[in-house]
Amino acid sequence: MGNTNSLKYGNSVNYYEGVVVEDRGDIVTLDVKGRLGYLELTKDMFIAEYPFKLGQVVGWKMSFLEQLPGDAGDSYVRGVMNPDHTIYMESTVSLVEDCAISVDISDNQGFFKTPMRMLLSDVPFEVGQTVGWNMSKIVQLGPDADDKYVSNIHNRERRAIEISNRNN
């Protein structure tokens, strides 16, 4: 298993925001703002002061995903409940598409699907490769939902139903 020292660019940590799009009990799914992908994690990766709800905005710090030598370990280093503390994460590539990849986060903590522009690599990604990155806990930015985002979700669902009805 690698560690934070295995990363070439691990010290290049950026701030990201996302919106809660699904809460399935122990797992929360986020749409990363800026069309940067989907992130699904267990709730122990969140600092939550409020109940989760659709459209709620969250923020965190994260480095780019990088390829690592060797196989992903069975666990990763867990951080303290501090939004500024960086956690070293490790994962295995589970899906490679033309312009995106998905990674399954070790210890069944969730998955991350992201566009290729969020990745640092010297060689093409392949299923089974190990990747690593630094990430902080995810913090809720407030109790309220982003109404514009929730409205967009409902509009997208409504259009999908209309298209399905037309095709049937």
Predicted regions and their residues:
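Long beta-sheet-rich domains in secretory-pathway and surface-associated proteins
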Residues: 19, 32, 37-38, 79
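Short boundary/loop segments of OB/S1/cold-shock single-stranded nucleic-acid-binding domains
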Residues: 1-16, 64-90, 148-168
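Short aromatic-glycine-enriched beta-strand elements
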Residues: 25-30, 98-103
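Short nucleic-acid-contacting surface segments enriched for D/E, G, S/T with interspersed K/R
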Residues: 45-60, 118-134
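Short, charged beta-turn/beta-strand-edge "cap" motif at the junction between a beta-strand
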Residues: 22-23, 61-68, 130-145
